[in-house]
Amino acid sequence: MHPALLRHHDRQRSGKGSSCRRFQEKPIPREDIRRVVDLARFSPSWKNTQPVRYVVVDDPVLKERIARECIPGQGFNTKTINRAAALAVVTYIPGLSGQGDAPLTEVQAAGWEMFDAGIAAQTFCLAARELDIGTCILGIFDAD
């Protein structure tokens, strides 16, 4: 097992690997964000198509607007977004997963981008944890 995953496993067993909802009030260095995204972008995906994209938002006004307009009525998650130093929005390119695998893609493609995005989100969290950056995956998405 990779040493980073072993350290994560040890944290999980000790209760220190859970989601973080109370963040320090200090910015995350851009270089650290780049490192986390760089590691996460190489997460496994169907046919190695890499359909996942990241948008990192650290502007407080924009984070507040996202919290207000994208997740109305979810007060707890709104507070989590506003307290975080940065918000990483995980997106994907529809129809890209498995591209080039024609027979399978036509039959099984629906939803695989979400699967690939989940793998990438977990890799993102593991990479962030190694830099002592707390994360919290919010299960909020636009189905359209």
Feature map (PLM): residue ranges:
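Acidic, surface-exposed loops and disordered segments
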Residues: 1-144
